[in-house]
């Protein structure tokens, strides 16, 4: 997984944690980034959003009115192995993207990865799917876009029983 790759790359570069069992100042045996990666990546995320605005301008000049946004605008946003973070620092740019989409009449969409499967019989996979889809919905909501800005969802497999899978979708 992507997060495992990130952790592997950072091995030996992370400092020992100064918090253990909620006691400050106690050195633990584990190593942690203490969510420092988000501080490092805020600039990258901000640049991604600015690049999105530039791509929208290019699309408008070339008559392209539908734009699929990258699910990686906010890296690791729904990754269960990474501490959660807020969109607060990016809200002004997200609103600017939404305003530009409305001004240009662009339809913005998301198409989350194939690992999002609503019909799965596995409750853990389903919960992770819900978390990831919520992240995408939150981004579109912050942009204040209408119902034409959609999240395209993979249907997934039938898991040996098409009727039961359809019922899981309905639930």
Regions found by a protein language model. Give the residues of each.
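Alpha/beta catalytic barrel-like cores
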Residues: 1-107, 116-119, 124-127, 138-145
